[in-house]
Structure formats: C-alpha cells, structure tokens
Amino acid sequence: MNYELLLDKSLQIGHDLLVNGAEISRVDDTLAHIYKAYGINEINIFTITCSIVVTIKTPENKIYTQSIRVFKSTTNLDRVERLNALSRYICKNKPSIEYISKQIDKIRKRPMYNDKIICLTYGMIAFTLVIYFNGTFADAIVAGLIGIILKIALNFVSKIDNNAPVINVLVSFIAGILAVFAVKFNFGQNLDIIVISNIMLLIPGVALTNALRDMIKGDTMSGTNRLIETILIAV
C-alpha cells in the first residue's frame, strides 16, 4: 500500500467536501474512516475553513504528513453527496488508489447546472421574494430582471477576484444602482422591496448553518472563522 498516495487522494476528497459546502466535522469523520479502513489507527486531522492538515502513522510505524489549502468555497450538495458515497464505498471495499483517483476525477468533471438555468433561477427567486414582501407585479418583474443581471455580474466578478465580501459589495452596488434607475423611470414602485429581494440572493445561508453546526459540535475555531466570514459576506 502506498500510504503517501492514499494520503494525497484522501486529502483531495476532504478538500472537495470542504469547497462544496460540507461542515468541518463531516470532513474530519470522512478522512478518519478512510484511513481506518486501510489499517491506520494513529490519525491526526486539523481542519479549518481554509486548510486541512493530516498526519498518519502506518502499521509499519512510518509517519506521513500532508496539507492542502482551500482558496474558495461554494455550495454543490450533489458533489458533496457523491463524495460521501465514494468515501462509504472506500471504507467498505478498500479499492485501489487508481480507482479512487478515477472516481474523484469523474466527480469533479460532472457538469453542474447550465449557467442560463442558474441565471433564470436567480430571477425567479427575486420575483417570488417581491411577491412575498407584498410588492407589486411590476416590482417583481424588475427584481427578476435585476436578479438575472446580478448572477451574470457575479460570474464575471468571480473570475477577477475570489474574495467573497468584495464580490458581494460590487454585485450589490450594481443591483442597487439598477433598482434606483428602475424606480426613477417608473418601471417599479417600491425601491426597498426590490433591493431586499435581490440582496437576499447573496445571503450565504448554507455557510451560516454550517458555522453554527461546527460551533455546536465543538469545532469552535472553524465555526468562528466561518461565522465571521459569513457575517462579512452578508453585511
């Protein structure tokens, strides 16, 4: 068994779990179960929102340490589920490193939803939120169109900068300016409802939930880091 390669591939699984919205405890448990499946009992895992460090001691008393950085995060629960399924398969069947590598690549190459569908979804959510907040139908139409533009701007700005708070500030500014002009030229009536409905699209609900779960489970450092990051993004 090449434990160094096992460590490398398992860290890729942990990295992808963390990037796609899994909580810290899920990452730790997944890695620990994988190592135990291959006969490794001395395991030390340190995971925070931006890094994973793992040290293992093999049955031959050799020690290996690797780390991996996490530079960005998103929400892709389909990928999280597939990575969880892969980790369960690994624990049950102990496949070769080559098999694990191929499955990781397969999951990474799995296409996400089409950008056009995601943009339309942003518009539909903004439209629905206006109705929920008792806005007019005209407000809903305006908010829906701004929601589509917001997602397009989000995709564009994300290619320039990975800093989530900065991205949200820029995109929120664009959405606010569009809402002001829409109301000024009588395309909409309630500026506050239009703006709130679009800003709601940027609130990181999954990240906030994971931060609280991490803190409840005792991962205070990771939970606090993620909570602060979430608050900065939301503000």
Description of each model-found segment:
Residues 184-235:
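Generic detector of multi-pass transmembrane helix bundles and their immediately adjacent loops
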Residues 73, 79-139, 143:
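Hydrophobic alpha-helical hairpins/lids featuring a short glycine-rich hinge
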Residues 112-203:
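Core alpha-helical transmembrane segments of integral membrane proteins
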